[in-house]
Amino acid sequence: MTNRLIYILLAAIAAILPASAAVRTSLGAPDLDAIRTASTDEASPYYYPTLLEKFSHNDTVMTDVEFQYFYYGALFQEDYDPYREQTDAATHMQLLPLFNKKEWSRAERRQIQAHAERCLLDIPTNLRQLTNLIYVYEQNGKVDLARIWQYKLNHLLLVIASSGNGLTPETAWVVVYPQDEYDFLNLSGITAKDQQFTPPSCDYIIVNRKTESSPEGYYFNIAELIRQYYIKHPSEADDAQLPDDAPQEQPQSTDPQQ
């Protein structure tokens, strides 16, 4: 799937992948303790349900900080599960061949939009489904809606980009869902080849290098992701014999979402 929106997205996050440093933004790495407190406090302006409602509106009023608290605040919600099953798996499989097409028919666009909206009800920050939704809006001639949701997607990508530079475990990008690793790289024009778990709490994504000087791969910090998974699945944590503060084994992942 190629279109001018993808190039706009690439331009928006082009600074994230040089070997020199992380993207220049005012956000920086997330303070997960502060986000945990604020996202579960009904009196906070960063209370997760408040930000979720704000995110769902067809406007561009959210700030960089609100996007950061919204993205990472999902980690601390009762229904959060990073390895949850694919939303509407049957439809997902049915639609897969369509994503090799450059243009979709009106009927195909309706199917893709409906599936994207169902997935976004489950995971509002699903980067891939946000991209699909934007593309449907553009093909349907709904330029204003495409721009609004492009704005939201760009800011979610910048939240991840600002969390590190991906070059070492210590400066790994911080993600909320495993699929975000692949979608983040793909939307940056980088193709993943393989994945390795790097103890205690990083995924290392091996990529197709663009040049000889390009990194062979990028690190993603999934420490809080794993911690929250084992909070929800304590029997698996017991089996893994993990210390309280350092997950050392990645749970079995389900198939990535389209």
Language model regions located:
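Alpha-helical solenoid repeat scaffolds, predominantly canonical TPR units
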Residues: 108, 115-116, 149
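Boundary/linker segments of alpha-helical solenoid repeat arrays
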Residues: 127-128, 155-168
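The tetratricopeptide repeat
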Residues: 128-129, 136
